[in-house]
């Protein structure tokens, strides 16, 4: 029975890639800088001491990081008994965004340039805004700028509730984000507005990767909170991914947990499981691992590393989340049977010690575990698509155009 479990620790980079300078990210290192802060005692809020990741260390995380950047992460166990294969991978795609990273993991790098809204203020074309107001029958709009999602809620959330005007904002990523209150504006209405925005952006040739619904609750600045009802409307990958090939060629199953289905625009997904928060995502993953039959991929995105800690530049929070994931990892490892393979990886970096609030261009870890996987280094992988090619070979699918199998 062949089953693959792919876990994306969203934003968990392990050192700047060779081309990081082009992105202003030379010297970034998500894991390395978190580990250094913990070792210095600068991350003792809600946790304490050096970063403690014994289970990820046994899978080769520390060694992969050392190969990536030349420095072993502070506090991690250098003498851990390695039980998995490990590597670090560079991104071939032109961007450092979520769809690019995930599509490349699934064998389809993004070699074109996304469109971006580069102006910090008045970010969106007036013609686009006018169409959204007209088609969605809006009283107007707020924002129209670059912003962190939590900052803009404190700034404009109360006005949004009073006026019914949605909050439009963007970032350095190829995104059009819409924040609306779940109760005063309505969740279904927000989703409808996002569908309209997706249509207008596509028909208008803007080439924007994602429209993101950002629902929130609360009654005043300071207590607004984004909910788990986020929804991403992505464009479809430009070529068949390993997910689509498994379904088409083997009549296989692909179980999306978290935001995976959104990222691939539902293409190649046979089942969707929603969960919010690391524990809930982990619980859902364990359930689906138990249920998985032959020719199945269970694919989970642990978004909180990125959304709650990376973008918010919260070092103690990121460290505590990693330690939580590591504590629970044995539950996952014991569900890996016989011919199964488990792959732990990331889609980009988001160094919480870095300036700004955006992603960082970094190598990602590739940690592979299974009873038949030979432990040891798999070296430097020139593209995330090596993961996709490895999975394609494992399931005996037609080869992907990009990537080399690691097993």
Swiss-Prot record:
GO biological process, one term: metabolic compound salvage
Pfam families to which the protein is assigned, alphabetical: Metalloenzyme
Protein location: Cytoplasm
Keywords, alphabetical: Cytoplasm, Isomerase, Manganese, Metal-binding
Annotated metabolic or biological route of this protein: Carbohydrate degradation; 2-deoxy-D-ribose 1-phosphate degradation; D-glyceraldehyde 3-phosphate and acetaldehyde from 2-deoxy-alpha-D-ribose 1-phosphate: step 1/2
EC id: 5.4.2.7
Disulfide cross-links: none
Cofactor: Mn(2+)
Binding site for Mn(2+) 2: 306, 311, 359
Free-text remark on how the cofactor is bound: Binds 2 manganese ions.
GO-annotated cellular components: cytosol
Job of this protein: Isomerase that catalyzes the conversion of deoxy-ribose 1-phosphate (dRib-1-P) and ribose 1-phosphate (Rib-1-P) to deoxy-ribose 5-phosphate (dRib-5-P) and ribose 5-phosphate (Rib-5-P), respectively.
Protein name: Phosphopentomutase
Organism in which the protein naturally occurs: Photorhabdus laumondii subsp. laumondii (strain DSM 15139 / CIP 105565 / TT01)
């Amino acid at each position: 029975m062949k089953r693959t479990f792919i876990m994306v620790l969203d934003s968990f980079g392990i050192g700047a890639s060779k081309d990081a300078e082009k992105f202003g990210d030379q010297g970034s290192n998500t894991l390395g800088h978190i580990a250094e802060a913990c070792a210095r005692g600068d991350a003792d809020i809600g946790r304490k001491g050096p970063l403690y990741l014994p289970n990820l260390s046994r899978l080769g995380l520390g060694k992969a990081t050392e190969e990536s950047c030349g420095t072993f992460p502070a506090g991690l166990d250098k003498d851990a008994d390695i039980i998995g294969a490990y590597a670090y991978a560079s991104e071939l795609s032109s961007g450092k965004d979520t769809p690019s990273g995930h599509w490349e993991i699934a064998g389809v790098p993004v070699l074109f340039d996304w469109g971006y809204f580069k102006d910090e203020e008045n970010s969106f074309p007036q013609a686009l805004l006018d169409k959204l107001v007209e088609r969605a029958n809006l009283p107007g709009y707020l924002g129209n700028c670059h912003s962190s999602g939590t900052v803009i809620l404190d700034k404009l959330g109360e006005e949004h509730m009073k006026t019914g005007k949605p909050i439009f904002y963007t970032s350095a990523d190829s995104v059009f984000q819409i924040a609306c209150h779940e109760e005063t504006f309505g969740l279904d209405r927000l989703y409808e507005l996002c569908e309209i925005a997706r249509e207008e952006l596509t028909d208008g040739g803007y080439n924007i990767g994602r429209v993101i619904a950002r629902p929130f609750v609360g009654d005043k600045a300071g207590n607004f909170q984004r909910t788990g009802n986020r929804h991403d409307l992505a464009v479809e990958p430009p070529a068949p991914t390993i997910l689509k090939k498994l379904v088409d060629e083997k009549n296989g199953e692909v179980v999306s947990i978290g935001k995976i289905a959104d990222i691939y625009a539902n293409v190649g997904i046979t089942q969707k499981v929603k969960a919010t928060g690391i524990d809930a995502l982990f619980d859902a993953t364990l359930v689906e691992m138990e249920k998985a039959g032959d020719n199945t991929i269970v694919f989970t995105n642990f978004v909180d590393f990125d959304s709650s800690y990376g973008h918010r530049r919260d070092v103690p929070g990121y460290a505590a989340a990693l330690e939580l994931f590591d504590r629970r990892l044995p539950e996952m490892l014991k569900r890996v049977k016989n011919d199964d393979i488990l792959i732990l990886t990331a889609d980009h970096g988001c160094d919480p010690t870095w300036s700004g609030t955006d992603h960082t261009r970094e190598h990602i870890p590739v940690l592979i575990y299974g009873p038949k996987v030979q432990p040891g280094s798999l070296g430097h992988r020139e593209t995330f698509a090596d993961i996709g090619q490895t999975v394609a070979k494992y399931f005996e699918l037609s080869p992907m155009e990009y990537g080399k199998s690691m097993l």
